[in-house]
């Protein structure tokens, strides 16, 4: 299924992106859910998939984590089932992500899907990421407050909420409506009837994650073996002092590593192309031979990217799931990064190069791409 999003992206980016929340009425016209509540419940029974149940009964919040064996104990009100990264595991839902590729691939995170019975929700809370919440089957009331300093508390160890807030948006969403919420705006949503919601999340790394990730890269590759030296050490009155020039030299030793262009780019491509959630990787059995890849493409078969696989480009270099893809065929690499579905035409003359075919076969045999159908 192909979803058509009615949205003026330049206007949205100027007026709303990371600035103000907005309701996009009928953002998807004639919206059809890509999966059923029963299918979502089935996914939450799988151990590889991150899921949780949140309920609010008799004034108490409860959270339980999947995999779940049964839902028979749940009542008919005040609970929600939430499943992360469904686009990694259920191919039809991945189509719901594609209209949002007007935004950078490296910023997109995953598709979280929730099923809620009347009164179901997770309470008032803050997120530190951008999210587009698409209303599927059913109706849900959403309230969004102003971005202010708010006290957060935990009514349950696995649930962080904020105090009640005054709403700047108070809307009932119907199928195809979209609510965009930037980071830091408090919000809460409660189902008015059995309802499906699809949350397209966009995350940004914080400074701690960047420093930690780069430090891991340095350690793995045994970089930074230059030792501090001070042949021009000045005398000092107090032996406990670290002099300003010594402090600056130590800091510059660290910055020199980060500022080395080749290392930084290699790390950044690997770091940003890694998925935060597990992928549904299923290498083909038996593995493809390069000539089989060639024949299949030439016969018109379509090569499809695995749901949730991050394929990013920095300059001329392409990275997939934390690995650099090496090939001199730049247009073919660009096609791998730009297109979800690929045909022989996308690869051009690269298919005539045995080394490129071998590389492509390795990617397919890793489970990163597969032939449609």
Indicate where each model-derived feature is located.
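Long, charge-rich, low-complexity alpha-helical segments
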Residues: 12, 19, 324-373
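Short coil/turn segments at secondary-structure boundaries
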Residues: 55-56, 265-269, 348
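Acidic, low-complexity/disordered tracts enriched in E/D and polar residues
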Residues: 259-337, 361, 373
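Active-site region of the double-stranded beta-helix
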Residues: 1-16, 28-177, 185-228, 232
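C-terminal amphipathic alpha-helical segment
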Residues: 220-292
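Short polybasic amphipathic segments
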Residues: 51-55, 142, 315-321, 371
